[in-house]
A protein has these predicted regions:
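N-terminal periplasmic "start-of-domain" segments of outer-membrane beta-barrel proteins
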Residues: 29-57, 88
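N-terminal periplasmic accessory domains that precede
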Residues: 64-67, 87-90, 102, 118-123, ...
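Gram-negative outer-membrane beta-barrel transporters
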Residues: 388-392, 481-483, 503-588, 628, ...
């Protein structure tokens, strides 16, 4: 009852706060990710969500995972657990490795991981200009892993001034310090951007410990340093050359699993990206040529002075992954209403992995995995034609041919018609296929299988979107259905107890997304969403097919509400409520049998306020999370944060 009163009060107060200055952008936004060239929401049938820099600025105490969790169809498990805990991104209920993360359109992977998905903790939020979430199967333009969709992180670039300095400084609960600064500028044919960020927190005790006494339990903190630099050259008016480098390193502490505290378990994770992006104007066409090198390194050391589980004494694991990515594509109008995107990309990856441990049963030293044997490459050729007719009919038709060094070739396609009626009602349908290639670990590790095929998916979605006159509101209703076959499964023979990865399972997910954004009182904005997601796997058990719900740690129902606006010219205030439904989790008994667990639903209420002065050059802010102190669980056996607050200042000169 207390929670309901607090939430109702927040909504009523926020309604009274909204007045005067207009700070909202056009609701018919322009996106880049959907077609690889700028296009309005009303002119594409794809389902895209935009998070602007203004929205990110009004999330001063949040990290990337928390911002993503407030979007329709997104759930990031671990977003509100210990700040340094791993974050699992679930888009429309799909597996973590079925959502592709890109930075400025470049796909990012961690070849050393079992699923090869990139760790979003390595992406500082301060250097992000905007985020475009492209839902549905997108392998035609983006290749492997884009089964559920693509999250494109677009970094901040140069300033229009010769010299511009911006940054932020904040402090909050758990002794959390966050500082960042950037120097950007542009003059004549040259522009530059240099950014640095530091983030440190004591964190919380990651595991819900039932063994260690309170005074012995430790907090599992982490710190992060991030650096980014780029320069842009325009030797002629039709060409831009932009080399860049990004580096991020995390150091933190871990616990020894669910309900088990650990005092001496440390990890480091760092990521280095270096590359160059080139753009050339050729008449009305634009040619993009880019290269990116990505290196990830992870180390885990458990030097157990006192074993918390009575088994482990010492362990050390080192995992290094390297990825080369090159792409060239051209965007050109072929007729008044038709735009063609065509290109090719090349991906090459390898990994080194070593592990050593000592337990009560003695040392364990599996053979190290070397980049000389754990490597793969693939090349793709793709094309997509976009029609934007004057009568309101829009369509995209595309395909990709991909060749992989191990399994051979595969083909994917997309068909995406939509119709815009009277500039207000958009009806859309998407039919597309997608794939995920086997990872290096699944192919070549001790459990590897070189005969694995890629996971293959067919996605269907359809719906309607409404654009109110005078930019007053936008609303969208979407149904999606995703069928994946040849799902890679970790199989253990019940007779020999030998384990190997095989293609076996079928996965089917479907759901509904309802979203609306309403503008009122000039600057007032209300955003609401509701999502329902269901998913079932079909697998072989005792020689028979069996089907059951398997969206572990993912809610069937989510609800979000955000209200915000300006009070006068300088003060902004807003509030957010997120309701997460029941979830399933699993644990293991003493005989290593799976045991199902039900996680209770929960509601989180947050509030944000900022005050601007010196012509918006300085903004002080306060960001409150979980105001009611809700107790809940994201992962069985692990803690979540209670009420936490952050205060700070943004500056821009």
């Amino acid at each position: 009852m207390k929670k309901k009163i607090f939430i109702a009060a927040a909504v009523l107060i926020s309604n009274q706060l909204l007045a005067q200055q207009d700070s909202t952008k056009n609701l018919n936004e322009v996106f880049i990710s959907a077609n690889k060239f700028p296009n309005k929401t009303s002119l594409t049938g794809k389902v895209v969500v935009l998070i602007t820099r203004d929205q990110l600025d009004k999330s001063g105490g949040s990290d990337l995972s928390q911002v993503l969790s407030e979007q329709a169809g997104m759930y990031v498990n671990g977003a509100n657990s210990n700040p340094g805990k791993d974050k699992s991104v679930y888009l429309r209920g799909a597996k973590v490795d079925h959502t592709l993360i890109t930075v400025d359109g470049v796909p990012l992977y961690d070849p050393s991981g079992i699923g090869s998905n990139f760790d979003i903790r390595l992406l500082p939020i301060d250097n992000i200009e905007r985020i475009e979430i492209l839902k549905g199967s997108q392998s035609t333009l983006y290749g492997s892993d884009a089964i559920a969709g693509v999250i494109n992180i677009i970094t901040r670039k140069d300033s229009k001034k010769p010299v511009n300095i911006d940054g932020m400084l904040s402090y909050g609960t758990h002794n959390t310090l966050h500082a960042s600064t950037a120097l950007r500028g542009m003059k004549d044919k040259f522009d530059y951007s240099v950014y640095y960020s530091y983030h440190k927190t004591n964190g919380i005790n990651e595991a819900t410990d039932t063994i260690t006494t309170a005074h012995e339990a430790d907090k599992d903190g982490f710190d992060q340093n991030s650096l980014y630099a780029s320069v842009g050259f325009r030797p002629v008016s039709t060409a831009t050359i932009r080399p860049y480098i990004r580096y991020s390193k995390i150091r933190g502490k871990l616990d020894n699993g669910a309900f088990t505290d650990e005092l001496d378990y440390d990890y480091t994770s760092d990521d280095l990206q270096a590359g160059v992006k080139n753009e050339f104007l050729i008449g009305k066409a634009k040619l993009n040529v880019l290269y990116n090198y990505n290196s990830t390194k992870r180390e885990y050391v458990d030097d157990s002075v006192k074993s918390r589980n009575g088994f482990d004494i010492y362990s050390k694991g080192n995992y290094t992954g390297r990825e080369h990515y090159a792409e060239a594509y051209i965007v050109m109008p072929v007729k008044t209403a038709v735009t063609l995107t065509a290109g090719m990309d090349y991906r090459s990856s390898n990994t080194d992995q070593q592990y050593h441990s000592v337990s009560v049963y003695g040392p364990y030293d599996p053979l190290p995995l070397s980049k000389d044997s754990l490597k793969q490459n693939q090349m793709g050729v793709y094309a997509a034609a976009v029609l934007n007719a004057r009568n309101g009919f829009n369509a995209e038709l595309g395909g990709r041919f991909n060749h992989h060094s191990t399994y051979g070739s595969n083909f994917v396609f997309n068909v995406n018609p939509s119709f815009l009626l009277k500039e207000q009602w958009k009806f859309f349908v998407n039919i597309s296929s997608a794939y995920k290639t086997p990872t290096l670990y699944q192919l070549y590790s001790e459990f590897g299988n070189k005969t694995l095929d890629p996971e293959k998916a067919i996605g269907i979605e359809g719906g309607v979107q409404f654009f109110a006159k005078k930019n007053k509101a936008v609303a969208r209703a979407t149904y999606f259905n995703r069928a994946v076959r040849d799902v890679i499964f970790f199989y253990t023979d019940p007779n020999t107890f030998q384990s190997v990865y095989i293609n076996q399972d079928k996965q089917n997910d479907h759901g509904i997304e309802l979203e609306t954004t309403i503008r009122f009182c000039k600057s007032g904005v209300i955003k609401m969403f509701y999502t329902w997601t269901d998913g079932r796997v079909t697998t072989r058990s005792n020689g028979k097919d069996t089907t059951y719900f398997n969206l572990i740690r993912r809610p069937k129902n989510t609800l979000g509400l955000t209200i915000g606006g300006n009070i006068g010219k300088r003060l902004y205030a807003g509030t957010t409520v997120n309701a997460i439904g029941k979830r399933a989790d699993i644990t293991y008994d003493a005989f290593f049998n799976q045991v199902g667990i039900k996680l209770d639903p929960y509601i989180l209420w947050g509030a944000y306020a900022q005050y601007s002065f010196l012509k918006n050059k300085i903004k002080v802010f306060a960001d409150l999370h979980n105001i009611t102190g809700t107790k809940y669980t994201e992962v069985y056996g692990f803690n979540t944060q209670g009420f936490n607050a952050t205060g700070g200042v943004h500056f821009n000169f």
